[in-house]
From Swiss-Prot:
It is found in: Secreted. This is Potassium channel toxin alpha-KTx 15.2. The keyword RNA-binding does not apply. Negative results: has no effect on Kv1.1/KCNA1, Kv1.2/KCNA2, Kv1.3/KCNA3, Kv7.1/KCNQ1, Kv7.1/KCNQ1+minK, and on Kir2.1/KCNJ2. It holds the Pfam family Toxin_2. Blocks both human ERG1/Kv11.1/KCNH2 potassium channels (in a reversible manner) and A-type voltage-gated potassium channels Kv4/KCND (in an irreversible manner). The presence of the Kv4-associated proteins DPP6 or DPP10 is mandatory to have high-affinity blockade of Kv4.2/KCND2 and Kv4.3/KCND3 channels. In contrast, the presence of the Kv4-associated protein KChIP1/KCNIP1 does not enhance the affinity blockade.
């Protein structure tokens, strides 16, 4: 039981470090849905949204 909890904790820590930074902030000003082309150029995926006047992209 102790060994399995150590393994579970290790997997949790590793997954947090790998997937913890799941958004890419840009310094490009935006309005509404104008972030698709910015995100496509920045990370290759058109998934993003305008937050506080700046584009935030999600890989």
């Amino acid at each position: 039981m102790k060994f399995s909890s150590i393994i579970l904790l290790t997997l949790l820590i590793c997954s947090m470090s790998k997937f913890g930074n799941c958004q890419v902030e840009t310094n490009v000003k935006c309005q509404g849905g104008s972030c698709a082309s910015v995100c496509r150029k920045a990370i290759g995926v058109a998934a993003g949204k305008c937050i506080n006047g700046r584009c935030v992209c999600y890989p």
